[in-house]
């Protein structure tokens, strides 16, 4: 007997050159916000496909061309993004704790990375892989983890970018700076969750922004959350 599988795929290339992001060789700005599937208060994590698609449509109507998912999603989500031109960063669900990941976390992350690439690499909407979100970006252990996982994703899938999303890029004094550079600088794109004037830097916004720009100099900088 024979077996057949049918799926949609597309061809595109997202690359980095200096501080520019290029889509098929042309400079582009990644504009958007994160979205957490399962956020609908009426459905919770049992969110049906039509509700997920309604939220994705809202992103398109807000002129977003990019979003990120904190954890892996069903193929149906990516099929919608494929069809509607919404670029995605799919992330390993490593968020906040532990602040400095060790070897056990790294082993689990590598297992999940392998499964993510195997399951979703045919989706052109996925342009980046994410190795984590909001750890202690100034910790040497976090930096080592990010460098290892970015290299691991590149080994699995050389065609895509790999990044870490930081909430500490602007923390010049708030956390001990074991590392000279924030961990996000070891990904392809410098990704920063920006809460200036709300959660931090209420009294010295200008100083914080100057520090961020100095840190990110020479790399693309994308705001991945804001508030």
Regions found by a protein language model. Give the residues of each.
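Short, positively charged
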Residues: 1-2, 202
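Active-site-adjacent substrate/metal-binding segments within catalytic domains
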Residues: 2-147, 162, 190, 221-222
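Extracellular glycoside hydrolase catalytic/binding regions
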Residues: 144-227
């Amino acid at each position: 007997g024979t077996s057949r599988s049918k799926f949609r795929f597309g061809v595109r290339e997202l690359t980095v050159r200096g501080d520019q992001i290029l889509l098929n060789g042309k400079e582009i700005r990644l504009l958007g916000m994160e979205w957490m599937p399962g956020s609908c208060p009426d459905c919770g994590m049992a969110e049906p496909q039509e509700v997920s698609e309604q939220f994705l449509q809202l992103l398109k109507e807000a002129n977003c061309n990019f979003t990120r998912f904190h954890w892996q999603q069903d193929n149906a989500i990516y099929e919608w993004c494929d069809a509607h031109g919404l670029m995605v960063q799919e992330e390993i669900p490593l968020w906040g704790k532990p602040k400095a990941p060790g070897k056990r976390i790294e082993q689990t992350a590598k297992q999940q990375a392998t499964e993510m690439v195997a399951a979703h690499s045919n989706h052109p909407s996925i342009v980046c892989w994410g190795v984590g979100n909001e750890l202690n970006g100034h910790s040497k252990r976090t930096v080592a983890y990010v460098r290892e996982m970015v290299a691991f994703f590149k080994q699995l899938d050389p065609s895509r970018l790999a990044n870490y999303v930081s909430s500490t890029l602007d923390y010049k004094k708030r956390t001990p700076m074991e590392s000279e550079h924030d961990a996000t600088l070891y990904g392809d794109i410098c990704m920063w969750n920006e809460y200036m004037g709300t959660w931090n830097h209420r009294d010295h916004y200008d100083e914080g922004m100057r520090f961020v720009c100095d840190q990110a100099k020479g790399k693309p900088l994308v705001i991945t959350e804001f508030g």
